[in-house]
Design a protein with these regions (language model features):
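Glycan-recognition and catalytic cores of secretory/periplasmic carbohydrate-active enzymes
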Residues: 1-365
Length: 365
């Protein structure tokens, strides 16, 4: 695979999108055109991924157009910090890719303040009875989800920034609970665990965005591959690396049966065939993270599998037409919902994976 050649194609398309999108915040490209999530819900969980793409591009090209566009979205997010009741467990996705990325790359003190504000909101969702960060809002006080493993790096950053161990302690406890209750013995994972919010007793494991209870939603699996690996990066806790490896072995075994592109759910009926390329792209990044962490003699499995996934995505599922929004095609939001569409987070992880191979990535997590 020629990662440099793929990146050059990405650079051309992302530059065209940056000029075309202006101040819009993209999510799903329908008929080749991104809608603007500012008009739908500014606090929507995916709204940080386009700025994440922009900061990655700015870091590796130096083009100030990317920086300017990313800064605008970050400033827009001040509105959701002011009305924080609408925020949720995905503040990591929102602010790691905006304010924290800005601060890390430019030293902007206002960005630091925004990131710390978001980290305190995330920490405030922790339930000590069950040792988990509460997912969503409304009546879901006892819910935790695997996605949150990708948000807790915001807490690790805040803890280091403030030299305050409380943030890491919350992140560790949540991750410990995920190892215990979200990961299954075979390395697959539950999307959701529901606890009694007063006692912490586990109650049920609903289907979530997969096919059914007990099935295997591939993007949730990808969150676990990368999320546990990031837990190891930030803490050095071997248990997290072992959990990441178990999740990775399960993911690799499944995509090896389908040309190294992930089905939407690994335990769904054979028909209809539903893909989720965003899961594959995210998992590839997680596999590359694991490859950096393991001994040299273990590295090949994770590195090679990641490269085969990224190569398969480029060969089978990419649109390079600069007049159409979205690079990675055939992403799926959930089983039976918005299937086979370009998703902004799919493009983010695809870009991150390619940049990782080239040694040009900016560690946003």
């Amino acid at each position: 695979m020629d990662a440099e050649k793929i990146f050059k194609k990405m650079e051309v398309k992302i530059h065209a999108e940056c000029l075309r999108l202006g101040e819009r915040i993209p999510y799903i490209a329908e008929n080749g055109t991104y809608s603007d999530m500012r008009d739908v819900k500014l606090s929507w969980w995916t709204n940080g991924f386009w700025p994440g793409i922009l900061w990655q591009m700015y870091q590796c090209t130096g083009d100030s157009a990317y920086k300017t566009a990313a800064e605008h979205t970050e400033q827009e997010f001040d509105k959701i910090l002011e009305h924080f009741e609408a925020l949720h467990h995905d503040v990591g996705f929102l602010f790691l890719h905006t304010a924290v990325a800005d601060y890390r790359l430019t030293g902007n003190p206002k960005s630091r303040t925004r990131g710390l504000h978001a980290a305190n909101i995330l920490a405030g969702r922790f339930n000590p009875a069950g040792n988990y960060i509460r997912a969503w809002n409304e009546d879901k006080t006892g819910w935790m989800i695997v996605d949150c493993l990708m948000n807790v790096p915001l807490l690790y950053w805040a803890g280091r920034e403030l030299k305050d161990p409380r943030f890491e302690e919350i992140a560790r406890r949540h991750t410990d609970t995920a190892v215990k209750y979200l990961q299954r013995p075979d390395g697959s994972c539950n999307h959701i665990a529901v606890f009694d919010p007063l006692t912490g007793e586990p109650l049920e494991f609903p289907a979530g965005q997969g096919y059914a209870e007990g099935s295997s939603w591939s993007r949730g699996q990808a969150w676990s591959v990368y999320g546990f690996a990031l837990g190891y990066r930030h803490t050095g806790t071997k248990e997290y690396l072992e959990a990441a490896k178990r999740a990775a072995h399960y993911f690799i075994a499944n995509v090896a049966c389908t040309g190294f592109v992930s089905l939407l759910d690994f335990r769904a009926p054979e028909e209809p065939v539903c893909w989720d390329t965003s899961a594959a792209a995210c998992a590839a990044c997680g596999l590359l993270e694991i490859a950096q962490a393991v001994d040299e003699n273990e590295k090949f499995l994770y590195q090679n599998s990641a490269e085969r996934i990224l190569e398969a995505l480029e060969e089978k599922h990419c649109c390079w037409d600069t007049e159409k929004d979205g690079i990675l095609q055939d992403g799926s939001v959930a089983y039976g919902k918005q299937v086979h569409v370009p998703l902004i987070y799919g493009d983010y992880f695809f870009l991150e994976g390619i940049l990782r191979l080239l040694g040009k990535d900016f560690m946003i997590w």
